[in-house]
């Protein structure tokens, strides 16, 4: 049985967005599930769009997500694998060899036309109300190709192509999709249309998974496969990732972010991987969250949907919160090192882990950590609006609020052994003494001791703050309530 070999071939032209990550994830899952090989290839022939540092960001982002590759370039500048080079700019000689085969067969020709002449052809086709096809304007006696002009493919046969896509099913396109496209540009570098076909064959790629936008170009690719007399790999097109509105492809204007932005916001790679997999794929059950191991075991191309998958950032954040809750404390602590607020810098590890244990269930992203924990490390800024805008507390007069806080302070002061359990018993007693509902009394105590909208369980929060600090903050609140 032929070993499955898949690839991800990004261009170093900018940041890695979620669409690119999913384009890497699906072939990686297919390779890992079948004990195959996953190849990373850098398609860097478009030098006009090259961005310094973008290639290094590709390595960094894939590694962060947990996608490893068996062959290709590495971050240390070396390559692994026997089918290199894995940068297209270093494979010019290979492309020229394949181009010569087409020239010798009469299936490629030098393009002698200037941009102005091509525009005139376009205008002529438009005047005739016809689609512009370059093959209708082929030069009758093209010059010998010397490498300074573009080299064009001469479509050998104008026919309808039909192919089987494991995701989209049977697809076909007629002659209108076929044209004489450029193989080698005037700068000597190949176009994507030519290079990826040569590379996939040379690197023995068995399955190509790419976006649905490539469906329209597939007949051109198939005509080139025929001309080169090579068998195409399995060609699969995954659905578009749609904007939150669901009516167009996701773009920057729809709030699309780079993978690096999500990483800096505290999205876990496990959550991102599970979320990306769900954008167009499911296992046929109600399960929503998958570990890497589960995805490798369950991923199937025939479970990828044909229609576009709507991007829902709220769902990603929800999913991230679920993964955070499932981490053990030590693992979560290690991941939080870059996310603590500056007020936590001087705190010791034991105390920070105690704080993190309380905050864990409320964290949706690691970036939430400072807002949820700052009052454990420094004195919070008094914000009386938290009381004034609280639906329950604004029913009380300021004197009633102060009285409740004073009674609470007096009762809590009676606790000798300051533990969560004893504090909870005291809070229950306070409910009886004051004849108040928890939503009123506990909210008032929580705000007075943390000046935050949310906090962990009140008794646990007070226990970790300590008796002196808790009582001091209650007294300060009493003095500041007008």
Question: What would you call each of these model-derived segments?
Answer:
Residues 1-127, 218-230:
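N-terminal Rossmann-like or analogous alpha/beta NTP/dinucleotide-binding catalytic cores
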Residues 27, 58, 102, 106, ...:
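Residue-level signal for inorganic ion chemistry
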Residues 329-434:
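Small-residue-rich helix-loop
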Residues 85-89, 184-185, 203-214, 242-275, ...:
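Conserved phosphate-binding loops in nucleotide/dinucleotide-binding enzymes
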Residues 16, 262-270, 306-312, 346-355, ...:
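Structural motif
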Residues 101, 109-237, 243-250, 258, ...:
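Active-site cores that bind ATP or allylic diphosphates and position pyrophosphate for catalysis
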Residues 421-481:
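Charged substrate- and nucleic-acid-binding regions of tRNA-handling and nucleotidyl-transfer enzymes
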Residues 32-44, 194-207, 228-242, 456-459, ...:
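Glycine-rich phosphate/pyrophosphate-binding loops
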């Amino acid at each position: 049985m032929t070993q499955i070999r898949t690839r991800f071939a990004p261009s170093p032209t900018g940041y890695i967005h979620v669409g690119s990550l999913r384009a890497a994830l699906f072939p990686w899952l297919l390779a890992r599930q079948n004990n195959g090989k996953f190849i990373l290839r850098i398609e860097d022939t478009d030098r006009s769009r090259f961005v310094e540092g973008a290639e290094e960001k590709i390595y960094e982002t894939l590694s962060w997500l947990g996608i490893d590759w068996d062959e290709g370039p590495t971050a240390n500048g070396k390559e692994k694998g026997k089918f290199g080079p894995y940068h297209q700019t270093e494979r010019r000689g290979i492309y020229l060899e394949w181009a010569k085969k087409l020239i010798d067969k009469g299936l490629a020709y030098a393009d002698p036309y200037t941009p102005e002449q091509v525009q005139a052809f376009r205008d002529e086709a438009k005047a005739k109300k016809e689609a512009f096809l370059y093959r209708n304007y082929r030069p009758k006696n093209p010059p010998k190709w010397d490498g300074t002009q573009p080299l064009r493919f001469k479509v050998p046969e104008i026919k309808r192509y039909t192919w089987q896509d494991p995701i989209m099913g049977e697809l076909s396109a007629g002659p209108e999709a076929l044209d004489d496209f450029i193989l080698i540009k005037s700068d000597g570098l190949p176009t994507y249309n030519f290079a990826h076909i040569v590379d996939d064959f040379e690197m023995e790629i068995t399955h190509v998974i790419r976006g649905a936008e490539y469906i329209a170009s597939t007949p051109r690719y198939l005509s080139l496969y025929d001309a080169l007399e090579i068998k195409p790999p399995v060609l699969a097109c995954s659905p578009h990732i749609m904007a939150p509105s669901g009516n167009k492809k996701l773009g920057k204007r729809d709030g699309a972010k780079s993978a690096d932005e999500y990483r800096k916001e505290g999205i876990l790679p496990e959550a991102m991987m599970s979320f990306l997999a769900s954008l167009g794929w499911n296992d046929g059950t109600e399960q929503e969250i998958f570990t890497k191991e589960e995805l490798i075991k369950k991923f199937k191309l025939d479970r990828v949907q044909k229609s576009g998958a709507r991007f829902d950032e709220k769902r990603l954040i929800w999913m991230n919160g679920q993964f955070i809750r499932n981490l053990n404390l030590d693992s979560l602590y290690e991941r939080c090192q870059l996310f603590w607020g500056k007020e936590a810098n001087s705190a010791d590890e034991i105390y920070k882990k105690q704080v993190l244990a309380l905050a864990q269930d409320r964290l949706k992203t690691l970036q939430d950590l400072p807002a949820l924990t700052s009052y454990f490390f420094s004195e919070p800024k008094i914000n009386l609006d938290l009381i004034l805008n609280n639906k329950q507390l604004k029913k009380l007069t300021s004197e009633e609020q102060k009285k409740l806080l004073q009674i609470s302070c007096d009762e809590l002061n009676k606790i000798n052994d300051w533990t969560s359990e004893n504090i909870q018993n005291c809070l229950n007693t306070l409910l009886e003494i004051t004849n108040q509902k928890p939503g009123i009394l506990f909210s008032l105590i929580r705000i007075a001791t943390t000046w935050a909208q949310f906090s962990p369980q009140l008794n646990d929060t007070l226990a970790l703050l300590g008796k002196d600090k808790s009582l001091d903050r209650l007294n300060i609140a009493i003095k500041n309530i007008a």
